[in-house]
Design a protein with these regions (language model features):
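Bacterial N-terminal signal peptides that target proteins for export
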Residues: 1-8
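Sequence context surrounding c-type heme c attachment/ligation sites in exported
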Residues: 24, 28-60, 66-151
Length: 151
């Protein structure tokens, strides 16, 4: 029942994310939205990374759950980098996001591919399958953060 409810909520969230830019009344709302989405993603990815590094015991069920959440939510923050959110709004987003949108889009696509593979690897149910997918996803995150996020 809990999984069904979570799936419904996540599916609804993803479906509404596509027109999300139109939902923000103020640029500050978009910034808060993308920061919140990134926080949730980081929390769930952190558990996967800890398992891959041996800092947490491997739990196939938890890995599959967390990877699915990461893969589902990964698309959400990118709907909130719209017009007007490039000003100083207490955000770490660099101007490069808006100056080179093609490069930013390429980084997004790399992340989306990595999280899809992460989700599949976690479903395999083995730590050996999970480790390289966590590494690739971490690299995709880092690549975007290096180019588009201030320290």
């Amino acid at each position: 029942m809990t999984r069904l409810l979570l799936a419904a909520v996540l599916s609804g969230g993803l479906a509404t994310a596509l027109p999300a830019a139109a939902q923000f009344q103020k640029p500050e709302d978009a910034v808060k939205y993308r920061q919140s989405a990134m926080t949730v993603i980081a929390h769930h990815f952190g558990g996967l990374a800890a398992m891959a590094q041996g800092k947490l015991p491997y739990d196939a069920k938890a890995a599959a759950f967390n990877a699915n959440i990461v893969a589902t939510l990964a698309h959400l923050p990118f709907t909130a980098f719209g017009e007007g959110t490039d000003m100083d709004l207490h955000t770490k987003a660099k101007a490069a996001i808006w100056k080179d949108p093609a490069k930013f889009k390429a980084a997004q696509d790399k992340l989306f591919a990595a999280v899809a593979k992460l989700d599949e690897a976690a479903k395999a149910g083995t730590l050996d399958a999970l480790k390289p997918a966590v590494g690739a996803t971490g690299e995709a995150c880092k690549g975007c953060h290096d180019d588009f996020r201030s320290k």
